[in-house]
From Swiss-Prot:
Catalytic activity: L-glutaminyl-[protein] + H2O = L-glutamyl-[protein] + NH4(+)
One GO term (biological process): chemotaxis
Phylogenetic lineage: Bacteria, Pseudomonadati, Thermodesulfobacteriota, Syntrophia, Syntrophales
Name recorded for this polypeptide: Probable chemoreceptor glutamine deamidase CheD 1
Keyword set, alphabetical order: Chemotaxis, Hydrolase
Molecular function (Gene Ontology), one example: protein-glutamine glutaminase activity
EC number: 3.5.1.44
Function: Probably deamidates glutamine residues to glutamate on methyl-accepting chemotaxis receptors (MCPs), playing an important role in chemotaxis.
UniProt KW Hydrolase keyword: yes
UniProt family annotation: Belongs to the CheD family.
InterPro entries given in the database record: CheD-like_sf, Chemorcpt_Glu_NH3ase_CheD, Cytotoxic_necrot_fac-like_cat
Length: 160
């Protein structure tokens, strides 16, 4: 019970109404929060890179590092706790341009586009989004309510 920390390149799921899934220091990374209100099951993924083809070996050992391997695993883990795709509420945050002032690598932008592409291809609606800009974010998912809160560096905690 309480805060369950989701590290970079990892995900957590829960059906414990006392849990709050939290991930910190989202820069160019993306947090994907999913929640099924019918069964009160939620999950939070903190991925770093858009595409596992960048490092196939790493994707095998750390699938949460990549959007294309982490997002499907997040959904499957929630399904194993009774969640259903048709009931899922999906919220996305992150994808900032923190250390890339010239916007040369555009990792944040590529991460955002991969999430949108994957959800679109799988007929999943993104219900809330706080992406881009140049600020770090913290994301919290309350399992009891399904509410997702985002705190940008220097800003207040607000519901997404």
């Amino acid at each position: 019970m309480g805060d369950v920390i989701v590290s970079i390149s990892d995900f957590r799921v829960s059906n414990n109404v006392g849990d709050i899934l939290v991930t910190y220091a989202l820069g160019s990374c993306i947090a994907v929060a999913i929640y099924d209100p019918k069964v009160k099951v939620g999950g939070l993924l903190h991925y770093m890179l858009p595409d596992s083809s960048l490092d196939v070996d790493k994707a095998k050992t750390t699938p949460g590092m990549f959007a294309d391997t982490g997002i499907p695993l997040l959904f499957k883990a929630c399904y194993s706790l009774g969640a259903q795709k048709k009931s899922m509420i999906v919220k996305v945050a992150g994808g900032a341009s923190i250390l890339d002032d010239t916007n040369f690598f555009r990792i944040g932008q590529k991460n955002i586009m991969m999430a949108r592409k994957m959800f679109w291809k799988n007929n999943v609606l993104i219900n809330g989004e706080d992406t881009g800009s140049n600020c770090n974010r913290t994301v919290r998912l309350e399992i009891k309510t399904g509410k997702v809160f985002v705190k940008s560096s220097g800003g207040p905690l607000r519901e997404l």
